[in-house]
């Protein structure tokens, strides 16, 4: 099989692979919710992809016959992309950053198996190298499905 220009473009757009993400975030199956990162500027912003598949365990019960991605998992996927913004900042202490709060999160439409979430996060603030806030948006086919601000803190 030969590479086509389209496959070359798709490969060159991957900034972080799933293996590289696993080296930066502590999450593992079934809670690793970022498949790849297509844009990443440490300390500024990140854009990640979550491919939603019917094989994910949450769809067994949410909801039988009409699978919908739980909103809490959409928010968690946004938080994981947000976490990638700070993981490679050299002046931050190493450790586990966890949720400290969420503000203004809104869900605009359902996310279903077959959808591809494109999640973009921007760092809004970072205080004392321990507390931060990101603005997050998740879109499917260019349509906003979820947005809000997520806070995190470093756990000792």
Curated annotation (Swiss-Prot):
It is found in: Cytoplasm. Signal peptide: none annotated. Keywords: Cytoplasm, Lipid A biosynthesis, Lipid biosynthesis, Lipid metabolism, Lyase. Pfam families: FabA. Its main location: cytoplasm. One of its GO terms (cellular component) is membrane. InterPro entries: FabA_FabZ, FabZ, HotDog_dom_sf. It comes from the Bacteria. The active site is at 62. Coiled coil: none annotated. It catalyses: a (3R)-hydroxyacyl-[ACP] = a (2E)-enoyl-[ACP] + H2O. GO terms for biological process: fatty acid biosynthetic process; lipid A biosynthetic process. Involved in unsaturated fatty acids biosynthesis. Catalyzes the dehydration of short chain beta-hydroxyacyl-ACPs and long chain saturated and unsaturated beta-hydroxyacyl-ACPs. NCBIfam families: fabZ, PRK00006.1. This is 3-hydroxyacyl-[acyl-carrier-protein] dehydratase FabZ.
